[in-house]
C-alpha cells in the first residue's frame, strides 16, 4: 500500500538548557495498510507493444462422453493357411478294378545259351570231281603233311604165328602168364583116400531134463548178499521214494543234477549214486588253487537240482522255502544192472524177455543252464526215464546268495515221438506246444527194467 501520513511533531522535553535539542532519528516504517480497491481498467494497449509470453497450460478437462459407434470397417484380407492336420485313418479297401488292357509286347529276350552239341551226322556222299588244275598257273609246291588222324579201332587178334628159331641172344626171362584156357573135361574118379584125422568137437547138445532135487545143504554162516549193483530212485516230490521189494535201501538224499564252477558245468547222471547227496546245500563245494588256498562262496558258482512238482514260485526261494521244491532220492542195492528202454512213441516199451519192470516214465535227454553250460543223460541210464514230465524239471541255486529259482534261461530237452513211416521223410514241421496234455503226447515214453535174479 502507499506510505501512511506523517506523524505529529514530537515534543521535546524541556531541558535544563534553554536551547532546542537536535532533531530525532527517523522512526521505523509503519505497518502495511489494507489492500486498496482495484482501479478502473486501463485504456487498450498500443499495437506497438511487445507480445507477451504464453500463459501456463490449463488444467485437464473432465473426460468427454462416449462417442457414437463408428461405421463398419472394410472387409479384411484373407487369413494365413492353417497347419497341416494329422493323417486320417486308413480307408477301407476299394472294390477290385476292371482288368487292364493288354500291355504292349515285351522287348526281344536275350539270346539263350548255345545248345548241346548234336550227334555226329552220317558221312556225306562223295562229291563230284573238281575241274583239272591249271598246271601252268599254279606251281606244284608240295604241301605240309596233314594232322595225324584219330586212332583207329583195335583190330582183331591175328592168328598165332609159327614158332621161330631161337634167337642169337641169351635166354630171356620167363614170359607173362598166358590167357586162361577153357576148362577141361572132368577126369575119372580117383581111388578112395586114406582115413582122415579126427575132427573138432561139435557144439554142445541141448540141455537135458532137470535132475531130481538134491538134499538140503548145511546152514550158512551169515545173511545172504546181493550182487552190489546200485539203483537210484528220484521221487520228483519232497517225499523220500521207497526201494522195490527185495532191494535194501542204502541211503536217502536230495537229487543233484549238475554243478557249475568257473563258468564250467559238471554233470551228474541221475542213474548213478553220485546224484543223490545225503545233505542239501545251495553251494556244496569249494575251490582251491596251487597256492594252497581254498575259497568258499567267493564266486558266482551254482548248483542245479531236480525239482519237485510244486507250483512255480514268483520270487527266488531262500532257507526253509527251498525244502518243498527239491526232489528227494534213494539209493538201493539191486540184484542186477537196471537199464532204460525208450519207445519214441506214446506206447510204453516192453521190457526184454526175462526182465521185469521197475517204473515207467518220460524220456529225459539233456538240459542247459546259465550261458551254454549243461549236461545230459545216457539213454540206457535209469536217469533218462523220469516218472513225471514237466517243462521245468530242475531249478538253479545261486550259492553265494543262498537262493533258488526257476530262471527263464533254463531249458530241458526230451526225446520226442517219431512215426516209423516218416523217419526218412522231409524236414519236420515246426510246432509250439503250450498245453501240458499236448506236450506229454509229443514226448517219448520209457520203462526201466531189471533182469530177474
Swiss-Prot record:
Residues 174-183 have a biased composition (Basic and acidic residues). PROSITE patterns: NC1_IV. Pfam families: C4, Collagen. Residues 228-453 form the Collagen IV NC1 domain. Alpha 3 and alpha 4 type IV collagens are colocalized and present only in basement membranes of kidney, eye, cochlea, lung and brain. Residues 26-44, 60-72, 95-122, 206-215 have a biased composition (Pro residues). Its main location: secreted. Keywords: Basement membrane, Cell adhesion, Collagen, Disulfide bond, Extracellular matrix, Hydroxylation, Repeat, Secreted. There are six type IV collagen isoforms, alpha 1(IV)-alpha 6(IV), each of which can form a triple helix structure with 2 other chains to generate type IV collagen network. The alpha 3(IV) chain forms a triple helical protomer with alpha 4(IV) and alpha 5(IV); this triple helical structure dimerizes through NC1-NC1 domain interactions such that the alpha 3(IV), alpha 4(IV) and alpha 5(IV) chains of one protomer connect with the alpha 5(IV), alpha 4(IV) and alpha 3(IV) chains of the opposite protomer, respectively. Associates with LAMB2 at the neuromuscular junction and in GBM. This is Collagen alpha-4(IV) chain. It comes from Bos taurus. The gene is COL4A4.
Amino acid at each position: 500500500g502507499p506510505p501512511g501520513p506523517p506523524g505529529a511533531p514530537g515534543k521535546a522535553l524541556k531541558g535544563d538548557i534553554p536551547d532546542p535539542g537536535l532533531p530525532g532519528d527517523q522512526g521505523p516504517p509503519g505497518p502495511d495498510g489494507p489492500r486498496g480497491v482495484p482501479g478502473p481498467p486501463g485504456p487498450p494497449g498500443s499495437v506497438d507493444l511487445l507480445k507477451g509470453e504464453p500463459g501456463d497450460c490449463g488444467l485437464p478437462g473432465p473426460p468427454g462422453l462416449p462417442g457414437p459407434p463408428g461405421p463398419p470397417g472394410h472387409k479384411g484380407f484373407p487369413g494365413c493357411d492353417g497347419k497341416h492336420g494329422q493323417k486320417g485313418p486308413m480307408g477301407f479297401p476299394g472294390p477290385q478294378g476292371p482288368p487292364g488292357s493288354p500291355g504292349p509286347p515285351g522287348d526281344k529276350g536275350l539270346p539263350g545259351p548255345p545248345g548241346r552239341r548234336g550227334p555226329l551226322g552220317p558221312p556225306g556222299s562223295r562229291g563230284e570231281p573238281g575241274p583239272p588244275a591249271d598246271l601252268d598257273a599254279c606251281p606244284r609246291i608240295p604241301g605240309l603233311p596233314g594232322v595225324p588222324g584219330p586212332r583207329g579201332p583195335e583190330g582183331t587178334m591175328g592168328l598165332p604165328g609159327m614158332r621161330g628159331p631161337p634167337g642169337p641172344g641169351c635166354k630171356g626171362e620167363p614170359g607173362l602168364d598166358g590167357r586162361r584156357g577153357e576148362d577141361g573135361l572132368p577126369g575119372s574118379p580117383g581111388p578112395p583116400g586114406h582115413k582122415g584125422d579126427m575132427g573138432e568137437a561139435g557144439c554142445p547138445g541141448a540141455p537135458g531134463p532137470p535132475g531130481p532135487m538134491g538134499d538140503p545143504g548145511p546152514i550158512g554162516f551169515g545173511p545172504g548178499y546181493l550182487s552190489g549193483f546200485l539203483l537210484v530212485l528220484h521221487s520228483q516230490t519232497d517225499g523220500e521214494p521207497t526201494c522195490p521189494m527185495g532191494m535194501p535201501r542204502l541211503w536217502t538224499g536230495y537229487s543233484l543234477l549238475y554243478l557249475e564252477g568257473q563258468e564250467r558245468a559238471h554233470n551228474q547222471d541221475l542213474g548213478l549214486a553220485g546224484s543223490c547227496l545225503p545233505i542239501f546245500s545251495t553251494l556244496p563245494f569249494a575251490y582251491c588253487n596251487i597256492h594252497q588256498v581254498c575259497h568258499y562262496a567267493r564266486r558266482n558258482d551254482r548248483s542245479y537240482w531236480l525239482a519237485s512238482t510244486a507250483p512255480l514260485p514268483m520270487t527266488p526261494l531262500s532257507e526253509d522255502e527251498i525244502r518243498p521244491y527239491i526232489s528227494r532220492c534213494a539209493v538201493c542195492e539191486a540184484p542186477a544192472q537196471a537199464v532204460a528202454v525208450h519207445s519214441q512213441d506214446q506206447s510204453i516199451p516192453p521190457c526184454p524177455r526175462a526182465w521185469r519192470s521197475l517204473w515207467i516214465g518220460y524220456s529225459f535227454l539233456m538240459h542247459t543252464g546259465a550261458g551254454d553250460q549243461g549236461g545230459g543223460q545216457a539213454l540206457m541210464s535209469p536217469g533218462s526215464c523220469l516218472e513225471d514230465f514237466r517243462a521245468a524239471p530242475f531249478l538253479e541255486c545261486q550259492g553265494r546268495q543262498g537262493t533258488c529259482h526257476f530262471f527263464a534261461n533254463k531249458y530241458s530237452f526230451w526225446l520226442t515221438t517219431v512215426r516209423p513211416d516218416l523217419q526218412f521223410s522231409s524236414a519236420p514241421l515246426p510246432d509250439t506246444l503250450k498245453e501240458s496234455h499236448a506236450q506229454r503226447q509229443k514226448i517219448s515214453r520209457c520203462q526201466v527194467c531189471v533182469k530177474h535174479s
